[in-house]
């Protein structure tokens, strides 16, 4: 067998083609699908964010009880003529809110609050439709990456659960002498909305990078920052729920002073529950405290201070990250927290004026997403080039 002679000066590998790097099998064939699913998730994210904002405006305009039936499908069509409007108005006039708060309301006034609630529910239907079309479409085309279909299916299941909780919340305001929904049910509804929004955002962040990139990045994760941002997620969620409890009983309007609460640190009658003796061992007393404006407003303020303080401390740790993108994420989060503090104080001083209150709610969404973004970069750092200064 002849042996090919080689010059002693021939470079290693000369004359042979270097193998072309191939993407890992974990990503092969799914790059386009990942981009498509990510765009779909981003559309869902924007819709859910709009749903939260419209829900807040529906509450602030006291429109949430204008539709007294739950018709997930047929309710998509609003009243189209005078007869249908009159029938819808008659249903509302049978509600305790009309009898006790809005007696004498005209049809035109009813239509204004009706459209807010109908728009809120219609947006929920649109979200369900966008999810179903996207999920079934990607599933039928077999474009969902391995292991992802349960996560995407879970989003739809949570969306359906959220619709049921929404009606459960509304139904609480149609009983007895109620003129508003139960604040605890409102908090459940808003809390689940933020959970859904967070899951969508997290999955979109994961799909923004290949599986192989994420696998390599995770080897350089910054464990301390992951832990700190996880703590921040818990505190932020608690603050969101407390904010919903405040909004549910209009507690923000009762104490329009800051940093005090109507001249005192602890509001008067903070632990008073009508008809229930003050007893730390009585569950009814604890539940009653959630209806005490001073109690929930005080907790909301204290949780806000805690969130701001932790955010500042964690920002100091975040600035020590060796990755520029991670440091930038913590910078953005710190600035958003400062802005949210100002919006919170403004909401208090304006006695929850709707423009300031809704901006405060949007601020909560922004902070929620920025915390998740910071946690994502702590868990999956973007490793750049030292020469280019991107570390």
From Swiss-Prot:
GO molecular function, one term: metal ion binding
Pathway named in the protein's UniProt entry: Porphyrin-containing compound metabolism; heme A biosynthesis; heme A from heme O: step 1/1
Keyword terms: Cell membrane, Heme biosynthesis, Iron, Membrane, Metal-binding, Oxidoreductase, Transmembrane, Transmembrane helix
Transmembrane segments: 37-57, 121-141, 152-172, 186-206, 229-249, 298-318, 332-352, 354-374
GO cellular component: plasma membrane
Ligand binding (heme): 300, 360
Record's catalysed reaction(s): Fe(II)-heme o + 2 A + H2O = Fe(II)-heme a + 2 AH2
InterPro entries in alphabetical order: COX15/CtaA_fam (IPR003780), HemA_synt_rhodobact (IPR054616), HemeA_Synthase_type2 (IPR023754)
Cofactor: heme b
Localization: Cell membrane
Enzyme Commission code(s) on record: 1.17.99.9
Record text on subunit structure and interactions: Interacts with CtaB.
Function: Catalyzes the conversion of heme O to heme A by two successive hydroxylations of the methyl group at C8. The first hydroxylation forms heme I, the second hydroxylation results in an unstable dihydroxymethyl group, which spontaneously dehydrates, resulting in the formyl group of heme A.
HAMAP family: HemeA_synth_type2
Name of protein: Heme A synthase
Gene designation per UniProt: ctaA
